[in-house]
């Protein structure tokens, strides 16, 4: 459960990189990830609470099952949760990437975060556990602005550009695990996202250039097909 507690800090950073839903019902929403807002209408969603032990989490699940609220733990839909069948930690808050390279990049970042936090624990070090309310503030900023806005640097208690914090995450915090994982190229693709914008940014740019939602849809199809035709590492040029 320690991994789940400390890795919550990075959830908004991951969401910001994946934002891809700026429209709803054919209209601009003013958000980069409206899908995240819609998802919050469901129960048992959002940034997860912390648990002192795994037994505490299991007790919550048992209580919900006994009360007939859920059939099993698969119906807990937090942004991050233990898998109910496998010994894995799921990261579930991402928007839908429209380029294969972006999806691979974000998966590699998540893997690297977990590997780095495990390495810290192995070396008798740790990462601070931050309050849920502060992480939720950053999540809202990611939903609203994607990589174009500011996030809170919770350690320094200051506001900084999301791009700067994500660059630090990759270039400083994760750097020493990337070569061991063999994922440096995939993780560093995030620099391309930071430079060119997310899918949400591209969709908005297309709409403002053309004024046509059909053009946005065509671009989404083209981006998806890049990876289908050519495979990861070749699309998004």
Regions found by a protein language model. Give the residues of each.
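Metal-dependent DNA replication initiation modules
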Residues: 2-48, 52-57
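Glycine-rich, acidic/polar active-site loops that bind/position phosphate-bearing ligands
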Residues: 1-8, 12-15, 114, 168-176
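C-terminal accessory/tail domains of diverse enzymes
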Residues: 34-237
């Amino acid at each position: 459960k320690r991994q789940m507690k400390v890795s919550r800090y990075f959830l908004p950073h991951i969401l910001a990189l994946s934002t891809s839903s700026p429209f709803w019902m054919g209209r601009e929403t003013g958000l980069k990830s409206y899908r995240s807002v819609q998802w919050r209408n469901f129960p048992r969603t959002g940034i997860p609470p912390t648990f002192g032990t795994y037994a505490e989490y299991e007790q919550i699940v048992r209580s919900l099952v006994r009360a007939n609220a859920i059939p099993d733990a698969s119906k807990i839909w937090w942004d991050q949760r233990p898998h109910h069948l496998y010994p894995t930690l799921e990261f579930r808050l991402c928007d839908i990437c429209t380029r294969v390279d972006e999806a691979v990049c974000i998966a590699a970042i998540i893997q690297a975060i977990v590997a780095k936090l495990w390495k810290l624990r192995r070396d008798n070090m740790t990462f601070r556990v931050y309050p849920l309310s502060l992480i939720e503030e950053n999540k809202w900023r990611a939903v609203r602005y994607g990589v174009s806005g500011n996030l809170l640097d919770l350690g320094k208690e200051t506001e900084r550009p999301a791009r700067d914090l994500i660059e630090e995450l990759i270039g400083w915090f994760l750097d020493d695990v990337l070569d061991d994982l063999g994922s440096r190229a995939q993780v560093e693709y995030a620099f391309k996202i930071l430079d060119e914008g997310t899918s949400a940014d591209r969709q908005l740019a297309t709409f403002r250039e053309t004024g046509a939602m059909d053009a946005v849809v065509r671009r989404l199809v083209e981006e998806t097909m890049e990876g289908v035709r050519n495979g990861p590492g070749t699309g998004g040029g």
